[in-house]
From Swiss-Prot:
Pyridoxal 5'-phosphate binds at residues 110-111, 247, 302. The lineage of its organism: Archaea, Methanobacteriati, Methanobacteriota, Thermococci, Thermococcales. This is Leucine/methionine racemase. Its EC number is 5.1.1.-, 5.1.1.2. It is an enzyme of class 5 (isomerase). GO terms for molecular function: identical protein binding; isomerase activity; pyridoxal phosphate binding; transaminase activity.
Amino acid sequence: MRKEEIIERYSRIFPKASRVTYAPIVAVKAKNAKVWDIEEREYIDFLSDAAVQNVGHNNEKVVKAIKEQAERLIHFTFIYGFTLEPLLLAEKLAEISPIEEPKIAFGLSGSDANDGAIKFARAYTKRRTLLSYLKSYYGSTYGASSITGLDFHVRALVGELSDVHYIPYPDCYRCPFGKERNSCKMECVEYIKAKFEGEVYADGVAALFAEPIQGDAGMVVPPEDYFKRVKRILDEHGILLAVDEVQSGLGRTGKWFAIEHFGVKPDIITVAKPLGGGLPISAVVGRAEIMDSLPPLGHAFTLIGNPVASRAALAVIEEIEEKDLLKRAEKLGSYAMKRLGKMKEEYELIGDVRGKGLMIGVDLVKDRETKERAYDEAKKVVWRAYELGLIVAFLQGNVLRIQPPLTIEKETLDEGLDKLERAIADVEEGRVGDEALKFVHGW
């Protein structure tokens, strides 16, 4: 079957609400950091399936766990009975969590995990108001989309949860308060205090939802002491801190959870994407008293705690431990940041390089002074990278998303960075025509 036919059939059967594409790759095989398409072309994957493949595509340990479990028991519903696999996984998550003696509720996606976190936070505090960040992304289910700070136009069509308020995220490259790093007085923290003195009754707020590093906003890393200052304000008013580690968790930034970089302990953590190694599974990890605040079946789905997905997830965590992938992510991330920093010196198109571990953003701009986002140029870079055999995407329309598997070989990382540099050079020097714009959509 031809690639073009498959893509055309996709457009006929799947709604646009379910997908957004960057390149016409019909994948048929993958291993570690490489993907092969239906035409037998090889690609280096700098996207990790949208930050899913932390331990690499088709990881041998994960595949073995799936096969063994599928031969023995595929499913026995968690909500009515008992199986060993989700228990072992939950105990392992509790072990690596920065929350002491937590309880864990399983789900199927990051979206439903964040929906669950909303329910647990409101039930425990008996408060309704929620705080979230502008440009945040928590998922596409009803609750998760209600606290998402990106403008998707979805809420205007379908409605949203009430009592949600937004605050600016501390973006030091494009400061929402117009400050520079050397003149910053943490106005982003003072804004929260002012919010509580004005339109929001602080003692009615259940939780602040936060990404420790804003992923889909363009890999935005906050100042090191930001969350410490915010947590002090929250604690004064009995407000919970719920952190979304769906994209940043399980070693991606060089820590089990990205929030650990900032020296605070959250009350609730949501985990998903890389947890199942490609299988659908998520978790809400929270303080026991918070997690016990909902009644029986208050956050339950028929397929949660699936033995196959649980066994795969346990294998993912074991692989991260056994191969010391936290240290590897930190080391390779530091190396990649240095190489990308050198590219920034060479190419005016690169305005900023930021990130932690192997969660990196390359901010493309039309002008370094104005920081005007280079939307068309980003599309052209992604297209040229595809032609060169590199899978890369962008966020916010202009920030290249660099998130290869934590298991990527050093030489493969270098090869991918070489391809990326060539793509950027070709775009900057005008060697990629406007016809590329009609092929790349993204968001």
